[in-house]
């Protein structure tokens, strides 16, 4: 209950702040053009702010320890492997980090190809063979080389804009309909209007999540193919097969999960950021 209240309160606060900022900027959100500007600024603004702080957030939320000086042979091999693959892919050497988790997973993040982070879990580092780990690292380096972080940020910005714009257009239509059937012509009123906007934000947000998840799944297949080029198809398949045999991964912050090697299973495949591992293995074998 507390979480729901905080979610509603946060949404209301964002709307209030957004309205104040738009008023200061002189943008009239009562017109379609003004509303579209409002939606684009906050839709893309939020997405790009998330991208800009993605490395910092990853280090804080996942407890990533960046390897500056390798402490043992395993860490040295890890850094050397990422360096070799980054050179093959034609990108600047990413920061390499380890985070403490028993699950088999890894992720890449960062605002650009030349400012990125590749992190692996301790469970993966000490629970997989070097060939399998090399396949995982190649997948993550491929994400960076393909510019997937920026691509998904742009997609997220577009769908955010759609959600903000569409929710308020539909809410205005409902408000006008209520006003036309009300003797006093008052419409929904401020609080009812904000409640309708909140519900529509949630509904359109679910649709938007499906769209982003679809593009994420497409990028996963491409990262697998890129990983196969960097490490070899057999190592990429071996890595995915090992992940398929392992336990289901736990929760990971959405921005990191989108570029993880192993996605969380979902009853609705439409909401999955990663295709099923079986399909990914089949796609690699078919190449």
UniProtKB/Swiss-Prot annotation:
Its cofactor is Zn(2+). Keywords: Cell inner membrane, Cell membrane, Hydrolase, Membrane, Metal-binding, Metalloprotease, Protease, Transmembrane, Transmembrane helix, Zinc. GO terms for molecular function: metalloendopeptidase activity; zinc ion binding. InterPro entries: HtpX_protease (IPR050083), Pept_M48_protease_HtpX (IPR022919), Peptidase_M48 (IPR001915). It comes from Shewanella loihica (strain ATCC BAA-1088 / PV-4). It is a multi-pass membrane protein. Disulfide bonds: none annotated. GO terms for cellular component: plasma membrane. NCBIfam families: PRK05457.1 (NF003965). Its main location: membrane. The keyword Coiled coil does not apply. Binds 1 zinc ion per subunit. Zn(2+) binds at residues 139, 143, 220. It comes from the Bacteria. This is Protease HtpX. One of its GO terms (biological process) is proteolysis. Its EC number is 3.4.24.-. It is found in: Cell inner membrane. The chain crosses the membrane at residues 4-24, 33-53, 154-174, 195-215. CDD domains: M48B_HtpX_like. The lineage of its organism: Bacteria, Pseudomonadati, Pseudomonadota, Gammaproteobacteria, Alteromonadales.
